[in-house]
């Protein structure tokens, strides 16, 4: 199904449940969802509070959903270092990432997140040695990817690795072989049904390869 939202206020100070806007995903894909019968539509919830606290802390999205899948791996959440938040694109090079691996090790953190452009500024082959270095320090690695696809024209790479199932599985196989523990997937195009399917496809394939997933530049929590 697609994601939904509250519409702008209508006559009589009413709000309605609205489907995605046509221009989402650069205008590609359908606005109206479809599914085979018998079927059911998702829960729709609204959280209201005088402050942001109840909105941030609510668990209702997960409380009303029965899990559709069982994970095949045990995942360990943890803390990590992330150079991009301070030094941004210029920090995505081998030497600076070694520094952030060392920082994670010194802090007793479990992970380091290496952000966009690593595929060109470090490269897959040199990344393998960086992953080995991090693991030698007791630090595991997350790598960034663009969600890509025909709806997405951003330049930051790696691109075109997550939208096609065949290419995605090939890339995740490489990640698993290197001992990468997770991925950060960024720049999603909207809330149309096609994008909801992409989220689920990424999550399912990631679990097949023992990878945790961070979604960034994405929809609000949908009960996954």
Predicted regions located by residue number:
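Long, contiguous hydrophobic alpha-helical segments, chiefly transmembrane helices and signal peptides
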Residues: 1, 43-48, 78-83, 97-103, ...
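Sparse, context-dependent recognition of short Cys/His-centered cofactor- or disulfide-binding micro-motifs
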Residues: 28-32, 66, 97, 168
